[in-house]
UniProtKB/Swiss-Prot annotation:
Belongs to the uricase family. It is an enzyme of class 1 (oxidoreductase). It comes from Haloferax volcanii (strain ATCC 29605 / DSM 3757 / JCM 8879 / NBRC 14742 / NCIMB 2012 / VKM B-1768 / DS2). One of its GO terms (biological process) is urate catabolic process. This is Uricase. Residues 283-308 are annotated as: Disordered.
């Protein structure tokens, strides 16, 4: 039994910058200014005291979902942290502190990202990023989910997930797909080298969920760095399947971040199909694949890294 509000778009200007994150070899990301901090939020609440609203039409204990929306928007102005997950914990704890009839809260959000735009420098010699004008990004975005309940009246985190979603990558060569089952149902030809196009969502959980909040930035895992690990491993590895590729990405993520307990993948194969291979050199013409498309899901933890 639960209810809530979703698609709550909230934007905060000049939020606290994210600074002091640990850098890694695969990424140049070392922080974000948070001049624009945007989220698409979903909140779900639980509590036995809400049962009469379902069984008897008695709304005495019901917090209207419109009020939940307003609560989220108001708290965006009160939040003094720098991370998506930190804001979710701040809002979730606020709900539990404010409404005793709520026994558990789950708050999740997709980050709304903004791209920096170049403008001429004042002296006309080159370009610099504008600190006023941004472009709404169509690229991948961060994700977070925080679940909370009470322990002796104090809100505590019971579950946490962070992620980067909507990552789309194309590798023009250096990927294969061979050695799979050949039977009367097989029509797909083996490919020793192919242009591989995948869409990818990556999720991770910390050993200590408090690390997800970003209060100690050196233990925070930015989604931008995980994104960069994915494309660097894709560039480095000659994979024989998408399964092979995401496993190698997972190993690298766990290697770089010992504070993580697990990493999970949801991948979709969007590989283009060859139309012409008779062009000079390595050139070819390809087309979009028809529906249906293949997908892969995989979870791994530190035990997988220890076995290497």
């Amino acid at each position: 039994m639960n209810y809530g509000k979703e698609n709550v778009a909230v934007y905060r200007t000049y939020a606290t910058p994210l600074e002091g994150v640990r850098t890694i070899p695969e990424s140049s990301f070392d922080g974000r200014d948070n001049v624009l901090f945007g989220l698409d939020v979903r909140v779900q609440v639980e509590g036995e005291e809400f049962l009469p609203s379902f069984s008897e039409g008695d709304n005495t204990k019901v917090v209207a979902t419109d009020s939940m929306k307003n609560f989220i928007l108001h708290h965006a102005g009160e939040y003094d942290g720098a991370t998506l997950e930190g804001f979710l914990e701040f809002v979730g704890s606020g709900f539990l502190d404010t409404y005793s009839q709520m026994s558990a809260v789950e708050v999740s959000a997709d980050e709304i990202r903004f791209d920096e735009l170049p403008v001429p420098e004042d002296d006309g010699d080159g370009y610099e990023a504008s600190d006023l004008v941004f472009r709404v990004s169509d690229n991948e975005s961060g994700y977070g989910s925080i679940s909370l309940t009470r322990d002796d009246g104090t809100p505590v985190i019971t579950d946490q997930t962070s992620g980067v979603t909507g990552l789309e990558l194309v590798k023009v060569e250096g990927s294969s797909f061979t050695g799979y089952v050949q039977d009367e149902y097989t029509t797909l030809p083996e490919r020793e080298d192919r242009t591989l196009y995948i869409s990818l969502d990556i999720f991770w959980s910390y050993d200590d969920p408090e690390d997800a909040l970003g209060e100690d930035p050196e233990r925070y895992v930015p989604s931008e760095q995980v994104r960069d690990i994915a494309h660097v491993v894709f560039d480095e590895v000659d994979s024989n399947s998408i399964q092979d590729l995401i496993y190698q990405i997972g190993l690298r993520v766990l290697e770089r971040y010992p504070q993580l307990a697990s990493v999970r993948f949801e991948a979709n194969n969007r590989t283009w199909l060859s139309v012409r291979d008779d062009l000079d050199g390595d050139a070819s013409v390809l087309r979009e694949p028809p529906a249906p498309t293949g997908f892969q899901q995989f979870s791994m933890d530190r035990g997988d890294l220890d076995e290497q």
